[in-house]
Each structure stands twice: as structure tokens, then as C-alpha cells.
UniProtKB/Swiss-Prot annotation:
PANTHER family: TRIGGER FACTOR CHAPERONE AND PEPTIDYL-PROLYL CIS/TRANS ISOMERASE, TRIGGER FACTOR-LIKE PROTEIN TIG, CHLOROPLASTIC
Signal peptide as annotated in the record: none
Residue stretches spanning the membrane: none
InterPro entries given in the database record: PPIase_dom_sf, PPIase_FKBP_dom, Trig_fac, Trigger_fac_C, Trigger_fac_C_sf, Trigger_fac_ribosome-bd_bac, Trigger_fac_ribosome-bd_sf, Trigger_fact/SurA_dom_sf
Compartments where found: Cytoplasm
Name by which UniProt lists this protein: Trigger factor
Enzymatic reactions: [protein]-peptidylproline (omega=180) = [protein]-peptidylproline (omega=0)
Matches recorded under SUPFAM superfamilies: FKBP-like, Triger factor/SurA peptide-binding domain-like, Trigger factor ribosome-binding domain
Pfam family, one: Trigger_C
Entry keyword annotation includes Metal-binding: no
């Protein structure tokens, strides 16, 4: 077999392939064995028609399409390997010759992976992230954990304060008329949660149990119900009950309840500090890595073919469908609720799809340029890491994956990201202190 590759405009080219006549004859034999089983010829049992009789009656041409179907997949795959091209979409095939006793010839118009013109990827200016855990961070985490153990206690006297949970009845009016979805009885609302229209919760601060108040708010311009967007509304509201959180004091018993490995408050704080420090350091590292990736990608120039974008959008729509399925919805139901269709969803995802592709191509191109590869030791380490993380044996992971190509590529790309970060120039954060 011979194959030639001729680059055309953009990311397309013409692949010309010639398969020897001997293989054509073998494919015709296979095609005959398949087709003859379906043929009825008077004087012969089904499937027992001799080849010469078949060709005399139907012509050898009747076998050509089946022979092409047999020859094409293998020949196309071998041609890709021989020419070293990397297709990103299904080719357009044009058979130029298929005939008994002659070579099989075809042309394939192929869209290939685009060339990447790398820009600067070393010495990138990256903002240094604060990875130090402060005493304030630790106390905030402790307070948050204690909050989960808090009891809700009815406030017998006093007014609504921020952080309280109020039970309310409300009746909403726009232009003096009630509107759909604007009424409720016995609704529990945490003040300060931001779950209601801006301004609603603030106006309940200071109100006492049993009191009524007209809460006046304006719906946001981008409110999901278009008929209410930007309009002023009055909610006649009654406070039925006020509850506040009674947070327990941190002692040795509570410390052990929050962390079974801690037998005292000091041990709990020490364990928590260590865990939070590791978490904050990891978060800081991830932010720095993301900035390095984005800058290296922005500095690269790539003409992404539409076929790659379409394929990535197919993948993203599928991923989105799987996520909403976990929430009990399917895509069609989502489209009905949102008023969107798939074409609109794909248009919303288009920029992200292009960025994903550009990022992957850029990192892969850097790996090629820097001769970065994942060796067996790297792969074994990653498998051990996955085994501990998911509590699955290495053998089970290998059996599930089938091969380690995905892990090999992931490790390779991670090495590229480490290279970007290790060679970056770090500058102090310009953000104001929190």
C-alpha cells in the first residue's frame, strides 16, 4: 500500500491511497461469500451459487461496494500511520478506482489538527497567591464547624437580627395586583442569606414576632420572570416566629465530635490548622497554575478548525446532559423550562469549547517542544495515587481503563504545567487585603 499527503488550504489536505490488486481480489472473495448467502438463483440452493454464475448473472460490479467497505477502514488507518497526520474529523472519501484485477485507489479530504505557533511560555508574570493560614482563617473555620452543631432556639423577646431565621407569611403586589408566586404562609427565611430579592431581608431586621411590615423592593432588571423584571413590588409581610442559633462552646467533648482523631481542643485546632494549611497551599498553587496556563495559551496562535469545535461542543453538551440528569432532569425538559434549544446552548458554550481546545493544543505543543514524556515510573506513581484516592486496587483501575494512555497523557500535561509554574516570574498580589 502507498499513501501520499498533500496539504491544502487551512487545516485540510488530500490523502491519496493505493491498495495492491491482490488485496482487492481477496476483498472481492470476502464480499462474494457475504453476498451469496442472500442470493436466490433458480437451480441452486440459497448460498450455493458458484462465483462464475453469480458474476455472469449480476456482474462483478455487484461486489464492489462490499469490497470497498472491507478495504477502506484498514487502508485509511494504515495511510494515517504512514503519513503521520492527525485527523480531527471524519474524512470525505472519493473512490477513484475499484476494479477486479486492478489496484484500489481512493482520495480522502481530511481535516487535521492545526499547527500551533507557540508564544512565550517561560518567564510568564504570575501573581503570587497568599498561601499562609492566619489565626482569623482558623477561627472562621472553627465557627463554621460549630455552626453546624448549633440548636435553633425561639427568640421569645427581641427583634429580628442578621443571622436569625424567621417564619413569615407574605403577599406580594405589583401595581396593586397580586402576582403569581408572590404569596406564601409559614415560610422560613434566614436573614442575610441573600436568598430573597435584594432589600427584602434587610427590611425585616428590627421587626418583632407578631408584627407586620410592608416590604418594598424592586425586582432586578435581569429577573427570570420577565413580567416582573425591573418592577417595584410591595410584600405585606407578617413575622410569625424568630429563631436564633445557639452555638455550643468549643470544649474537649465538642472537639472530639468534630474530629474523632482529636481528644482535646488543642489537638483539634492543631489537626484543623494542618488540614487547612495544606488546603490553602493547594488552592494557591492551583490559581497560579491556572494563570500560567491561560497566559501561555493566550500567547499561542492557533487556527482551530470548525470540525474540532463541533466535536468539543458535542462532548460539552453530553457532559451538561449528564450533570442535569443527576438533578432529575433530561435535556428536553431543561430546554422546555429554560426556553432554549440545543443550538442556543451550543452557541453559549462555543467560547469555552474554543478555549478548551486551544489550551489542550498549546500544552501538548509545549510538551512536544520540550520533549516531555511520562515514563513507566510516572504512570505507576499516578496509579498508586488514584488507588489511595478512590480506595480501588491498581489492577482494578487498569482493568477499568483498558490501557494507561489517558493517565500517560494526563501526567505529561501535568509536567508541562509544572514547567510553566516553575519558570514563571512571580509578582506580589495587587489585590487589597481581605
Amino acid at each position: 500500500m502507498t499513501a501520499t499527503w498533500e496539504k491544502k488550504e487551512g487545516n485540510e489536505g488530500l490523502l491519496k491511497v493505493t491498495v495492491p490488486a491482490e488485496k482487492v481480489d481477496k476483498a472481492l472473495d470476502q464480499a462474494f461469500k457475504k453476498v451469496v448467502k442472500q442470493i436466490n438463483v433458480p437451480g441452486f440452493r440459497k448460498g450455493k451459487v458458484p462465483r462464475p454464475i453469480f458474476e455472469q448473472r449480476f456482474g462483478v460490479e455487484a461486489l464492489y461496494q462490499d469490497a470497498v467497505d472491507i478495504l477502506l477502514p484498514e487502508a485509511y488507518g494504515e495511510a494515517i500511520d504512514e503519513t503521520g497526520i492527525n485527523p480531527v474529523a471524519q474524512p470525505e472519501i472519493n473512490v477513484t478506482q475499484i476494479e477486479k484485477g486492478k489496484d484500489f485507489e481512493f482520495e480522502a479530504t481530511v481535516t487535521v489538527e492545526p499547527e500551533v505557533q507557540l508564544g512565550d511560555y517561560k518567564g510568564l508574570e504570575i501573581e503570587k497567591q497568599d498561601s499562609e493560614l492566619t489565626d482569623e482563617d482558623l477561627q472562621e473555620a472553627i465557627d463554621h464547624s460549630l455552626g453546624h452543631l448549633a440548636d435553633m432556639v425561639v427568640k421569645e423577646d427581641g427583634a429580628v437580627e442578621n443571622g436569625d431565621t424567621v417564619n413569615i407569611d407574605f403577599d406580594g403586589y405589583v401595581d396593586g395586583e397580586q402576582f403569581e408566586g408572590g404569596q406564601a404562609d409559614g415560610y422560613d427565611l434566614e436573614i442575610g442569606s441573600g436568598s430573597f430579592i435584594p432589600g427584602f431581608e434587610d427590611q425585616l431586621v428590627g421587626v418583632k414576632t407578631g408584627e407586620e411590615k410592608d416590604v418594598v423592593v424592586t425586582f432586578p432588571e435581569e429577573y427570570h420572570a420577565e413580567e416582573l423584571a425591573g418592577k417595584k413590588a410591595t410584600f405585606k409581610t407578617k413575622v410569625n416566629e424568630i429563631k436564633y442559633k445557639e452555638v455550643p462552646e468549643l470544649d474537649d467533648e465538642i472537639a472530639n465530635e468534630l474530629d474523632s482523631d482529636a481528644n482535646s481542643v488543642d489537638e483539634y485546632k492543631e489537626n484543623l490548622r494542618k488540614r487547612l494549611s495544606e488546603q490553602k497551599a493547594e488552592e494557591a498553587e492551583n490559581v497560579e497554575k491556572e494563570e500560567a496556563i491561560n497566559k501561555a495559551t493566550d500567547n499561542a496562535t492557533i487556527d482551530i478548525p470548525q470540525a474540532m469545535i463541533d466535536t468539543e461542543l458535542d462532548r460539552m453538551v453530553q457532559e451538561f446532559g449528564q450533570r442535569i440528569q443527576q438533578q432529575g432532569l433530561d435535556l428536553q425538559t431543561y430546554f422546555q423550562i429554560s426556553g432554549q434549544d440545543e443550538s442556543q446552548l451550543r452557541e453559549q458554550m462555543k467560547d469555552d469549547a474554543e478555549q478548551r481546545i486551544k489550551t489542550n493544543l498549546t500544552l501538548s505543543a509545549i510538551a512536544d517542544k520540550e520533549n516531555i514524556e511520562a515514563n513507566d515510573e510516572d504512570i505507576d506513581k499516578e496509579l498508586e495515587k488514584m488507588s489511595k484516592q478512590f480506595n480501588i486496587s491498581v489492577e482494578d483501575i487498569k482493568n477499568t481503563l483498558g490501557n494507561t494512555d489517558i493517565i500517560k497523557n494526563d501526567v505529561r500535561i501535568q509536567k508541562v504545567i509544572d514547567l510553566l509554574r516553575d519558570n514563571a516570574k512571580y509578582v506580589e498580589s495587587t489585590k487589597e487585603d481581605k
